[in-house]
Each structure stands twice: as structure tokens, then as C-alpha cells.
UniProtKB/Swiss-Prot annotation:
Residues 108-718 are lumenal. Contains a cytoplasmic domain responsible for its TGN localization and recycling from the cell surface. The record marks 107-108 as: Cleavage, first. It is a single-pass type I membrane protein. The gene is FURIN. This is Furin. The record marks 75-76 as: Cleavage, second. Glycans are attached at residues 387, 440, 553. Pfam families: P_proprotein, Peptidase_S8, S8_pro-domain. Ca(2+) 2 binds at residues 174, 179, 181. Ca(2+) 1 binds at residues 115, 162, 205, 208, 210, 212. Residues 1-26 form the signal peptide. It comes from Bos taurus (Bovine).
Amino acid sequence: MELRPWLFWVVAAAGALVLLVADARGEKVFTNTWAVHIPGGPAVADRVARKHGFLNLGQIFGDYYHFWHRAVTKRSLSPHRLGHNRLQREPQVKWLEQQVAKRRAKRDIYQEPTDPKFPQQWYLSGVTQRDLNVKEAWAQGYTGRGIVVSILDDGIEKNHPDLAGNYDPGASFDVNDQDPDPQPRYTQMNDNRHGTRCAGEVAAVANNGVCGVGVAYNARIGGVRMLDGEVTDAVEARSLGLNPNHIHIYSASWGPEDDGKTVDGPAHLAEEAFFRGVSQGRGGLGSIFVWASGNGGREHDSCNCDGYTNSIYTLSISSATQFGNVPWYSEACSSTLATTYSSGNQNEKQIVTTDLRQKCTESHTGTSAFAPLAAGIIALTLEANKNLTWRDMQHLVVRTSKPAHLNANDWATNGVGRKVSHSYGYGLLDAGAMVALAQNWTTVAPQRKCTIDILTEPKDIGKRLEVRKTVTACLGEPSHITRLEHAQARLTLSYNRRGDLAIHLVSPMGTRSTLLAARPHDYSADGFNDWAFMTTHSWDEDPSGEWVLEIENTSEANNYGTLTKFTLVLYGTAPEGLPTPPESIGCKTLTSSQACVVCEEGFSLHQKNCVQHCPPGFAPQVLDTHYSTENDVEIIRASVCTPCHASCATCQGPAPTDCLSCPSHASLDPVEQTCSRQSQSSRESHQQQPPPPPRPPPAEVATEPRLRADLLPSHLPEVVAGLSCAFIVLVFVTVFLVLQLRSGFSFRGVKVYTMDRGLISYKGLPPEAWQEECPSDSEEDEGRGERTAFIKDQSAL
């Protein structure tokens, strides 16, 4: 018994020695397995294997099987002839081959970066799992290759040794100085280091012996210099819209003043740039805008008063300290989607990245630090699946973010069982989980938007105002939503001290979002003017049901104000196949499968749904329909949208004599109400000759009166207007000619060119005027020639 362990090690050592020798000589290493072709099925293969002392390891594919022989050496430099020849003589065996061990190397196998500062990048992968799980994404082979990221900031030091290898000029521009070079402006205080530091977090080169590594260290990185100068709406829009089909991700760590009293957001051009980015960027998949949530924590600011982070088009990121606490500068709001790491207290580590003047720093901090980390993780995710849309990415973030290790007192479970916080969103980004889920991700259904006006009259806010409204989330319309993504409460209100207000929104599934917390420094009496407070906390909930808006005065003062407008805007999806035709209401009788067979009065049945107006090409008609009940078949008279005759474009019935309008290739007979095809010659003759007068209907045929197209009252105003204009013109011309005849010989005439007959006479100018302007005949002729040439040009145009 004691010899068995020794025997195992001897065999293992012998096998290893065989491999080493074979590798050195370049020889084949034969294994104790065979691939065998045996028609007839697995039972025949099993029988042949047992007959010759083999074990059938299973089917490779088709009639090919994998045989193993325990008595044959596992590794050998020569083939096993005896067993091979026995199998070869078997009639059922059509082909066989002893298997050879092949050397195969994994490509892009993960190796830990060798950069000197990498061990200090605790947030990429740590032993306590308080990290972003970036090394797991690297181990899966994703490093950001093929993805382009642009940092919208104060420039990027493109010649930095840890950035130059990944620098992309196509993702860079200097909007401040209007040139392609984004190099920052150097000052004694290094004020413009922001963009260079952010760039290093995303794509610092790996294994080059400089500084640390970027999250997506094989991604391409660029920068837009747009903050080192006067920032206008045009500057922002141009930066946000730079090369949208080349740049995949835009990272921004800036916004309005974080002073606890500002309410500001993108203006017209920047808002349009956001919309164009998500609708047209990346070939229609949508640009991804990553935004830092804000630095106004000390001022009790709310990032819902920042229109950039509060936008549905941005992926808003917050931060946590090394030990999972809320940083002192962090802002809380319901628009935050997820969190990455940044700095905190003095005894906690900060972020390692590139710095100005080709240096490295270990003390990067603030919102500048955490948004670029998210941009890098998103670059890894896009490499795993380049077909992800901008909304797919937000779905992945919601589904994979981890609330563990993050400390806050406002963690809550929403209506679909996810934990969410105003400080952290759905938790820490998990790079490994995101790339794993992205690889087989199915694109979400197209976005739907449901807009509901809640208020019917202004309401006094007082100490506390509560507005309740039960909604169907646009049921029966194309915008019907069953799975929510973003929800907006667009509010217009006046209040004498805006900072005392706290606003909450409660979803039908009970999720309570803080749209606005009290801001002690906000003394403004401006209120809010159609401001869209956004929440992501009800993601994937069913928005149908009662929504509750709560507005509260948090101070003891007798403040006053009025809520004048409240519009609930829901963004989301509905399951594929859910019927959402226009005006799908008014059904009177439903089948067991919820298909409509009879509509209420004023509605017509169209494709198993009730509509108030039949679509073009259809007309309502009362027909007998057969309705199958459990034990019988009933005949029901119902209004149904029936198709027009093939010759009609629109109609009032299914017959060829029910046409109201015709296709472009046909003309309408106003008497017969039929459409007839026209040849090219007949169309030309109709254009040259006036149409014949309408033929009166035969007197002897008694038919039901029908509204004729040539008697429609809608043409009467046009006829009256035309006759009136003709009469006025006739009177004017008559009076003008009479006056000209009476005074025609007492004034001089000037001939100028016109388009029609070439000459027209302007009369009525006194001779003194000509003498004053034309001191000589030559000057008069010259002036007349110039005017004539001018009028010729104008007439030609």
C-alpha cells in the first residue's frame, strides 16, 4: 500500500520527462486515446470497445467516438501498434487514429501588469473584494481594445509616456483655441491637470515601466480641451458632438457650480447634442456619456439640480471611499445609477494616475477620479459586445452593480427586489460581471415615452402638498409601458424660499425617490420652471397604478408657493408582441384570448382592436360577424374597417365607386367616384385642356343621395377668394389705365426691362426730379443703363 504514492510520482515524473524530451526534439507525443469511426450507433461502438479492452469515452460527433485504453502508456514517443492493429481489423471500424498531444497556448492570457504603481491601484483588484473586479474582466481577455474614449475637460498631455501609446487624435480637439491639438495650457500651479489625470485612469499603457495602468489599458484615448476658456452652449455642444461615429464613450467630470443653490443644465444646443449622440452616434447604437454626479456634498447640494447628471442620456456615477463610505464631497440624488471608488479621509488611499509634465500621481481625488474609472469599465464591456446600445449599457449597470461593502443609511429595496441608494445608485460597478453578461446580451426593446399631465388646476403648497394620480402608463397607445427605465416629474412651481423644499415621488410599487432634498444655501424665490426631476430607482417596475408626489416645507417658517404644473414622463419598454395599436380602446366584447370582436358605438374593429378612425386605405362598414361562444356560433352586426377597392387610395366603402381619392397614377371621376388610370398622353392633354363640365346623373335612376366630390363645401372658400381677387385686380387695372390716359403726356417715361415683354413704362415722375438727379444727358443715359442692367439681372433671377 505504501508503494502506491511513490508509483504515482514515478509515473508522473516519467510523463513529464517524455514531454520535455519530445518538446526539445520536436517529436510527437502519443496518448492512450483513439478517435474511431464506427457506423451503427453508440451501442455498436460500445461493443467494439469492450471486445478489444477499450473504454468508449463518448461520441465526438456523428459516428466518431473517443476510445481510451488503460493499459497503454499515457504519454509515449511511439505509437501503440498492437491495440491499433486489433481495432483496425474490426469490420465495423472504418477509420481510427491514435491521438497526439498538441501544444496550445492561450491567446491574450491575463498576466498581472508590471507597472511600478500597479500594486497601489487597490480599486482595480484587492484581497478584501472592496474593488471594481477589473482583473476578472482582464482575465476574460478584455482590455478595451478597439474602443475609443474621449475626455471632455481642460486638455490631455498627448506626449505623456503612459498615454502616448494609446493616444487617438481622432478623439481629440481644442475647442477653446479652435485647433486639433488638445495639449493643456501649462501654468505654475498646474491648474489644467484635470483631463490628463482622467485620461490615465481610463487608458494608461500597461507593462511599460511607467506609473500604473488604465482600466482599459488597450483602449484608444483622446481629449477635448473645452474648460480652459469661456464655456458656452456652443462650446459644450461641439465637444459633446465630436466625431460621434468614431468616439464610443465621452467622459465628463464637470457641471454647474456645486454651491448648493444653483439650478442649471444643458442649454438648447447641448441638449440637442445629447439627443443626436444617443440617436445617431456609433452608427445608431448611441454615444455613451459618462458623467460625474458632483462635488457639492459639503454645501448640501443635490445632483438632481444638475441638468447633466439628471439627464436620461447620461450614465451618472457617484463615488465611495476605500472603506466603502460616502465621501464628504459626494452629492446624493435619485438620478445616480452606480458607483466607483475615489478618495475619502486622510487615512484612506486615493487614485493612481498620470499627471502633468509627464509625471505620475497617487493622490487623484474628487469627482474627477470616479467617472473615468466607470468609462474604462464601460470600454471593457463594449469590447465584449460592440452591439450594445446606450440603453443596453444602463441595463447592464443596473443588473450587475453590487451594493455590498457600501455603507449608507438610505439603502432600500425597490419594487423588483433590487437594493438602491441615493448616495450609490445600485452599487459598485463590477467589471467582471458586466463583460460576462454583455457577451450574450439581447438588445432591449425600443424605448417608449409616455407623457401624462397630472394637474388640472394649480395647487397651494403650504406646509405639505400631496398629489395622487392613478395612471395606466398609456395603455392602449403605442407608448404603453410595462417595464420602467427612467421616470421624470416635470414641475413648475413658485416658492418664496426654494431651498426649504423637499420633493419625493412614490411609484405604484412603493419605491420612494427623493427628487430634491433641502438645500440650506438656496435662498432663491425663483422656484422651478418645467424642471425635470429624474429617478432611476424604479427601474424595471410596472408603472401602472397610483403615483404620489410629495412636496414639503422642511423649515419652521411660514413659506408659501404654488404648484402650477406636474407632468409625469415615463420611459421604458413593453414585452415584444404586446398589442399596442393606436386608440386600442372602446371594446365591447372580448374573446377568451382577449381579442376584440365587437366595439362600442363610435368605434370600428381593425385587426382585433377598436379604433375611432380607420387607417388610410380602410373604411368603416357594418357587417355580420361570426362570434364563437363555448357551445354555439352567434352572428353579430358590428362596425368593421374594411379595405378599400384596389383602385382607390381612400374611400367611404369597399366598392370601386366609393373612392374619395386616387393614387398618383390615376384620376378621380367626381360623378362616378371611380379612379381610372391615366396614360402619359392623356395626362398631358388634361393639363393643356380644361376639364369637361360634369355630366348630370341620369334622371330615371333613383339612387340614394351621395356626397359628391365636386359639391364638397370645402372648395367654396377657394372659389370665392379667387373670384374676389380677380375682381379687385380688374378694378385696379381699369383705374390705373384711366389715370395714365389723363396724365400720360405731362410726364416723362423711363423704359426698363421686365421678364415678359421686355419693356414697361414707369410714369408720373416730375421733370425736376430727373433734372436734380441727372445733371447731364450723358449721366442720365449712364444711370439709365445701370438701372436697366440691374433690373435685367433681377428679372433673370
